[in-house]
Amino acid sequence: MTPTNQSSGTTNASVEVLSEDGPMPINVMMQEGVKALTKILSNQLQDRQAFQNAPHAMQFVIRNGGKALSNARLEELKDALPKMDSLSLEDELAKIDGQSAYHIDSAEEKETFESKIGQIASRNSADFIIEEDLQNILDDDLKDSELNLDGEEAEIIFDYESQELDTPDGIGEKISQMIESVLPGGFGSEEQGGLRTVTNVEDLDVAEEVTDIDHDTVDAARLHGDGKHSISSRKHSRSKNSKKNGHVRRHDFYDESRDHKSCCPHHHYENLSKLRNYYYHDFEYISKTENRVPDFSVLVNESSPMCLFCEYYMVFGEPPRNMIKWYNRTFGYNRMPNPPRDEQDSRKRNR
């Protein structure tokens, strides 16, 4: 890519994508051209702060088989069409590509083509055919609806010269609009992925890789969804079993396999007989201590992890009664493991 400085101070640049292996689908050529143009616009324009100076512009051209006309070529035809008869118009349109790929063969097709030209010219009452009408003629009457580049050396040329680009953020949108304007049906939905819609420069850079990523993303999302469904099913099943057994567990999301025994004294089963009833968390810890000055150094010196209640107990020297009551009111008593059967019988006998 070699920029060319014009006398007016504007800078022109173009990218050519050549097909060395014969005819190629238009979308493949589009993708390669878009990727190349994106690199130019992002690296060249932004690096030299072009958008802080005079506005730049951009043009999209397809040659050797393209159905759409470049902006410059369209302007030429606007001036030339009113001066042509139908035969010279057909010849001029055939020059869009070097192979004369577009032809109006039958007399009926020629008559239809001429009538459309006459209707548009009289309706506009001007010396040229407007761009939308000309493009409609090309779409309706020219052949090769698949829009394949079928020359020996097909090429797509990107040139930012005719449309102003105000900010870097508008690059992707402009490219998307221009490419969509030259495709017969806009951006089609392809089963195999590929170039669909482009909204910004970052999307352009990864347009070709989307096909490879889509399958992995879908598979990962499916696995994630299946995992969530499996967890939800297990929770639902566990909740049904709990209700069937007469227990309503409001916090099945807690890890019940977590070992509370080594955490603090009130988690030990052997001390349950010294407490007044099963809901021992609403009452005092086993050993009573006198109030003392809080000692936060114990948290630094303690190597084993402690629960929030135990941290309070170690620092302040007294059980966090209000914290425990709030916890039990919020999460319920049934989360705590049931004591062994012999401990329950022992407590009943001691009453």
Swiss-Prot record:
Coiled coil stretches, renumbered: none
Compositional bias ranges of the Polar residues kind: 1-14
Protein name (database record): Protein IBD2
Signal peptide boundaries: none
Region annotated Disordered, chain positions: 1-20, 222-249
Known role: Part of a checkpoint which monitors spindle integrity and prevents premature exit from mitosis. This cell-cycle arrest depends upon inhibition of the G-protein TEM1 by the BFA1/BUB2 complex.
Subunit description: Interacts with BFA1.
Modified residues (Phosphoserine): 100, 106
Gene designation per UniProt: IBD2
Residue(s) carrying Phosphothreonine: 211
Keywords, alphabetical: Cell cycle, Cell division, Cytoplasm, Cytoskeleton, Mitosis, Phosphoprotein
Location (main, coarse): cytoplasm
Superkingdom as given in the UniProt entry: Eukaryota
Family the UniProt entry places it in: Belongs to the IBD2 family.
Annotated Basic residues bias: 231-249
One Gene Ontology cellular component annotation held by this UniProt entry: cytoplasm
GO biological process: cell division; mitotic spindle assembly checkpoint signaling
InterPro entries: IBD2
Location of the protein in the cell: Cytoplasm, Cytoskeleton, Spindle pole
